[in-house]
Amino acid sequence: MDLSESMEVDNGTTSENLKHVQITFFSKDKDLPEIPDAVFDVPTVAECDDLNLLLNKTIQATDDAWKEKKFEFLVGETFLRTSLAEFIEEYEVETETILKIECIIGIEAPKPLHDIQAPDWVSSVQVANGHTKSTNLFSIFSTTYGGDIVIVDRKGKETKLSVNSANRILKCSGIVRTTKKVQLEGTEFIVGGENQLLTLYEIEKGALVEKIVFRGHERAVECVSVNSDATRAISGSVDTNLKVWNLDPSDEATIYEKEEEESSAKKKRKKDTRTKVPMVTIGGHRDKVSSVVWCPWKSGHAFSCSWDHTVVQWDLELAGEVSRIKGPKSFTSIDIHPTSNLLISSCTDAIPRLYDPKNRDGAMVKQSFIGHQNGWVESVKWNPVDENQFVSVSTDKTAKMWDVRSSKSSLFDIHGHEDRILCAAWNEGLIATGSADCSIKIFETS
């Protein structure tokens, strides 16, 4: 196919008036057929639609079964979003040699699904496992600075509950157990906050029932993460410590019993609510712990990040440090992909950074992602089913969906919030964001 002829028709020009550049296509995607390594002489006015047409025709010429697809194009580490001429000028691309263009299968932009008003600033948000388009069970779980819990099902129906406790600013949450029963019956989750406690709640007959209170931190609890079999939780605090908690209902070893006499009312309450102390306390950070995640490749290990500019891998059984990453700023969040094992991080600046914690040079930044404009990135979350994609949310009021193959331009910008975005989650084809504008926005991804 001669792309120059197409350009002449569209622009009313002749091939003599068009500047040209030589390009070749390639792909690292194993799901794509082999792309012919032919060199094409194309006009620099060509845009993505023109390159899509050329590439599809090229593949069809060698593969009769090929069905046309939409591609995204990368030059180096930047997505091509303009004409070749504009891209070459903006990024000062050398055109004396053949321009190599990487092809990846295109995806649709995230679609707004629900916009939920919360009673206060949204401090944490989770997307539940196993609740897909075919179910109407709850998908989104969130907490607020006012002590509220907001639960949203796939159709956007809201359930708002309150912990009804003084000084109960909630800062973090984790889903412990979900059920397929109506009215959320039997759902369990753990929350932590300003009062230095974590609490495990169960929903019974549409109401919150306090099951376990976890006592041990000396300042506000900033983060919590539940392991895959929901038997352990790890938390981090402004007190700079990590604590590991036993969630197993049959556990007796970490139950705290006060020796002094208690009122009959308190005794009655204790029949329903247990107080537990930590299994392990780990010190090692020098400032508040802002995020914790379980290690996907090593049982009994976890990662934490802190405002002391470090990410640390811990052996929880030995209560010792395994490795340490030193960052340029205070860390605000981390997430580790379950299959690639790469660690994405955010700091008190506008740049998400990628690390490989399993590599000997894991403390070195693999990539820095440039795109947020002001303030800092509050949270980053991987797409658990695609090791190339993650989302970042920022105090600049935007969320950005990234592909790790492009560090200089995001896949999509997600707008809608009117104030700082404080938290994010990505699971089951849903991105959820929570903001200081007192709203939770839910987007559907392809």
UniProtKB/Swiss-Prot annotation:
The keyword Nucleus applies. Residues 256-275 are annotated as: Disordered. Residues 21-105 are annotated as: Ubiquitin-like (UBL) domain. It holds the Pfam family WD40. WD repeats lie at residues 171-211, 216-255, 284-324, 326-365, 371-412, 416-446. Coiled coil: none annotated. The keyword Repeat applies. It is found in: Nucleus, Nucleolus; Nucleus, Nucleoplasm. Keywords: Nucleus, Repeat, Ribosome biogenesis, rRNA processing, WD repeat. GO terms for biological process: maturation of 5.8S rRNA from tricistronic rRNA transcript (SSU-rRNA, 5.8S rRNA, LSU-rRNA); maturation of LSU-rRNA from tricistronic rRNA transcript (SSU-rRNA, 5.8S rRNA, LSU-rRNA). Its main location: nucleus. Signal peptide: none annotated. SMART domains: WD40 (SM00320). PANTHER family: RIBOSOME BIOGENESIS PROTEIN WDR12, WD40 REPEAT PROTEIN 12, 37. Required for maturation of ribosomal RNAs and formation of the large ribosomal subunit. This is Ribosome biogenesis protein WDR12 homolog. It comes from Caenorhabditis briggsae. The lineage of its organism: Eukaryota, Metazoa, Ecdysozoa, Nematoda, Chromadorea. The gene is wdr-12.
